[in-house]
Amino acid sequence: MIRTLQPGQRREVWIASVTGERELVYAADDVLLEAPNWTLDGTALVLNGDGKLWTFDVESRKVAQVPLTGIPDLNNDHVLAPDGTGIFLSGNDGHIYRAELDGGAARMITVDDGSFHFLHGVSPDGRELAYVGIEAGDFTQPGRLMTVPVSGGATTPLNVDGHCDGPEYSPDGEWLYFNTEAFTDQPGHAQLARIPAPDGNSSGGAPEQLMESETVDWFPHLSPDGQLASYIRFPGGTVGHPADLPVDVVLVPAGDWTTPLQTRHLFGGQGTLNVNSWSPDSTRFAYVAYPLATTDTTKD
């Protein structure tokens, strides 16, 4: 399903600096853009909107559609390939694809295995993808952490209890970071965790909780240098990661998730920070807000 803006709503693309500044770089009320990635050369953001893929030039502030073929409408799960030229994409048909950032034909990676595949991570060596599998597209079922080679083939399930989402490799490839409901019986109370990245001898391990909080915490993203991390925080009691509610985008040291360095209050949720949005030099990260006409976005 393609998301659209409500009457009186607009989308705002923000760039925050690790030194505390932030800048509204693009705002409009037409296409609902989501989930920024940052290109490897640092010149552009890559977002989805209206089922398509778009680039936003950070200097010129211009948006352009990436001309892709052989792929259905996209959702907001997409990750850049480590080579800087390719991108892995999740389609609304439940499959994962690879395409080039300059456009052209996309290639399907996953097969029809009775699951929807929601991509979130690519290993630093570019060989493996981490995704969430949901059986038969039944969103009442818990999401399972999975990996698959970028060339396709056999998938590897990771044994973590509870609903999981957002698996993303650490920059050194040693860990998978994600959110999970494994630590609580409270419905929807997602918390941040990590497990050792699977290799030929293991398929993960017991999840290590990064912190304990009363909020609902989703989508941990480490900076390329591994020193910092961002995530999105929903109010306590939130089930899933819905759109259009007050949320926080939080910056923390990667070694101490309990000590926020920055907290950005905004109206958003779904689409705000679904994928890794760090600049390649680890100095900035991007996110999207979706304020209504009555929402003040000039203050944190």
Question: What spans do the regions from the language model cover?
Answer:
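Sequence signature of WD/YWTD-type beta-propeller architectures
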Residues: 1-300
